[in-house]
């Protein structure tokens, strides 16, 4: 007797912030390639900077706390030192000059800035810049010294703490424990950049050995990911230096640190020995975010070179795994309900945490040949098969119109099935092989159905599944209860001047660190009070959350799509992540900023998330970017951010990582920066453009 399936189509999923109905997403077979798991090498981080932790010691001769060290300068154009601390920056004094300068220990005068007392060397006077470094509402003061046309070679840097800090118990304890009291970000804008990445996204699980790769390369030879001339799986050619070493400084979720060597021996996933590509392994045993700094040192033309990248690597457990068995049954509308049987390795019960599932679906044509039908995807959770307490399945639904549209029938097959963690979009289990779909019950040939509208018309129900009745009943029934919602970003307060927008309301989830899914859930819950629907004007990560919401869950945004106007408009959103997220994880934790790290904002996290967003949902987004003004000797929104981001940028996200492929790009405004406290006004305070967004919104 055939095993019968309980119809486990997930109608609603209970979340912490209310009950949401996930969409049963589907799309054309021509879109299959858009959902491939990204190659980490394609989103590798590249920079010409390095980050140092400064641990002071007590000088018996001077009766002071100080740090002295040598910093290599390899740029002939510019050299910048930027400092961060949990203590007031005015409590430190900095001296810096080339070792070749005969007057390196002498000083002419003291320049008093907002933060530092800077000793100006007789040799050369730096440009002093004060700023606010960070992401959205999570920031810390920064102080930068920039030398134009510096002497190439080793520089002596001496940092001295003030007498008041010597009496500070917290400072004294950090000195005793050798905990860095200060961070120094060094930028050498030159052709020599570090390039680093994890080798795979498929093993980011506890108990695994995660491989990390790094090299130096020439920026002038770099082909950007956005370039049409970039070959598939391209990576730059390594620069070979002398006296080379590489290491990883790993911050574990429990706060401890490890230093791990990297090797160019061909035995650490680093391809060939002595080819300039270094590899190393991280053994992960804890759940959570790992703060990783990759440090590369060497000598080029007799001068020292040091570069580092900061990564944030989320580690989860492999709590669900595909077994390879797939079953299906038709529902009352002849739609194909597909069930992917799963188990939970090393667990006695199957984990029912909501996940993201994706699969390609194939059928059979009149000649008995396999034919691609469509892809299916959505948020779901493992549910038991009827009559079993141990066999669980994830579900997806394929609208019967997709099958009829390509003239297919049973038997059916699935391929490239992916199950991903909903918080990180780390692949939990995936298979590239083809699996037969076992049909439960008799299959009704949908080609015999008379379809209206005609099959060439792709309906919203085909793409999203059936809208919940309580939403569907409100379509076209206006009661005057619709709103434009203004949303902030990561760890932020209100950023939009509400007086610039008509019929608007401010979303207030202030000073919180949310992943995209949690952020989207809270937005949906807030918007549910507007029974006619709502639209969104979003800043920074608010744009990611808005796109996540309209993609995966039914909400008032779906009611608004029936009306004229824009449903989602965003400003300064890091759709492809920001390299600042990894660096901020290192700096933010060191200086004690309240909001913790957010892996959804990293370039890796964004790449994993973005591959799950279909083209029709991207097309709903109208986005705008900004950048610093140009024409000055030094152009920046935040000078410290320039050391981490591509140029140009808005101080948080660069113009290389703001594009949303398939979205509607509107404009890039100069002389507007991401956040308050930067070199130019905050991008959300552009009143003229705010009023334009208001007039173009649905509500």
Swiss-Prot record:
Gene3D superfamilies: alpha/beta hydrolase. One of its GO terms (biological process) is regulation of gene expression. GO terms for cellular component: extracellular space. N- and O-glycosylated. The N-terminus is blocked. Keywords: Glycoprotein, Signal. InterPro entries: AB_hydrolase_fold. Residues 680-699 are annotated as: Disordered. Residues 1-18 form the signal peptide. The keyword Transferase does not apply. Glycans are attached at residues 130, 283, 346, 430. The keyword Signal applies. Involved in cell density sensing and might synchronize the onset of development by triggering aggregation when a majority of the cells in a given area have starved. This is Conditioned medium factor. It comes from Dictyostelium discoideum (Social amoeba). The lineage of its organism: Eukaryota, Amoebozoa, Evosea, Eumycetozoa, Dictyostelia. The gene is cmfA.
